[in-house]
Amino acid sequence: MRNEKRKVQMQSAKLPLKAVAIVALVLLAVSSAVISVDAHMPGAKPLPEFELEPISIYDGDTLIDISLDDIGDYHGEICVCGGCAFRATQLGISKILGDEIPARDDIKIVSRLPTPGSRDCFQYITGTGPGIETKTKGEYKVILPDGTAVVNLSNKDLKKASNDNTLDNFRFEVCRKSTGECFEVVLKLGVFSEDYFELRKKVKFGIPENATSEEKALFKSEWEDTRDKFLTSPDWELFEDVEEPEEEEPDVVGGATFLLILVIGLILLVALVHSRKKAS
């Protein structure tokens, strides 16, 4: 009888241990899923070589140059959204001010894109983010395409708002507050592959189901290609309402004139030499 009681006690002791093990495995799986959502792009290939001019602004009476590397350091890496936000700000400022350098507190950016990468870029440029040493501050807002204002800009809330992102979210108003002038920077169709946002939902959020290993690999490749476009492609390949500069036509008239002068010079030289020989 005592042996039977001991067996029952041992079995009952094993049950909680099994339950604990199962719970631990579930928590591990959940934590792994969270890591995959929070991570930028584990194992992404290195950045290509690129040359992008910095964004120059006046912070009070101090002229500062903000490079894409500065944005990457602030955010943690150069990502798709950070690269896009940087290029969009560059373009918007140039469209409104030309070669004039803006004051930081005269810049207002209204973004339709609720992502941590774009947030960190815009906050760094406007001086509105945490941990930025600045004398002045511009203005930065996130307003979704349907008009909803995203007030909480924490990573958690931005990611929640971003699970339905489409190309329509990649629109940014860059404004000069003192004059009210604004230019809306709109990303072109084709910068993202057709299945990019569908794959993003599966990989990052498990919507409508978890991504397969093949889909994860495909999304990683498309993510890398898109990131690299924002580093190396000209504005007219990325954004609407930007005309490709015309190639300079060869100066046919100038070339013909030069050739004619050269021929005349040679004729005169030959005539001069011939006349000297005749005189001697």
Regions found by a protein language model. Name each.
Residues 1-40, 248-280:
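Secretory targeting signatures
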Residues 38-78, 86-249:
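Non-transmembrane, aqueous-exposed alpha-helical and coiled segments at domain scale
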